[in-house]
Amino acid sequence: SEDGRIYVGSYEEFGYFVHTPYNTLEYHSLKDEVKDFTFHNDEIWNIVCVQGEIVFQSFGSLFFYNGNSVEGIRVKSLPLNLFQVGNTFYSQRINGGLCVFSGRKMEELIPRKVFGNSDVLAGLPYDDAVLMLTRNQGGFLLYRDGRVEKWKTECDDIFRKHTINRAVITKDSCYVVGTISDGIYALDKKGK
């Protein structure tokens, strides 16, 4: 992370490592800093930095660490994923729509049916829009000004045939898509 810490999580435990002057790592647990929260099978499986806070995600809770304190919240609808595009923090609920975070609450932005009942695997910046990679739609969708449209690429047929697992954007604006059974693909902003 930007602060030089290595954030980690596991079953009902999360925190960070810092480098010591002796070239070792020292662990600092954050679990006991969560006030008024009862852990219940919370396994941390995703960690992201959002608007200056570190967010630890379990299958039923989110933990927000601002550098001084930790707040834990149970979510009614379980988040499938978390991703940030610009200053906006998104999550898709399991079997639900795509939501935007407003404070500590998720507000539905796009209903699941717009994605063909598919999972949104990633959200990436694309000029003034959000480029979303979906599992069942065979590739990418663009969200701009309240509308969703297909982003056509030269790999659409491949993405329909093979299970897509992940996508990232490189520093030079190349979209890299990983599949489970057919390797990785790199696309430019024109979908080539």
Regions found by a protein language model. Name each.
Residues 1-192:
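Carboxylate-rich, polar loop motifs that coordinate divalent cations or form catalytic acidic clusters
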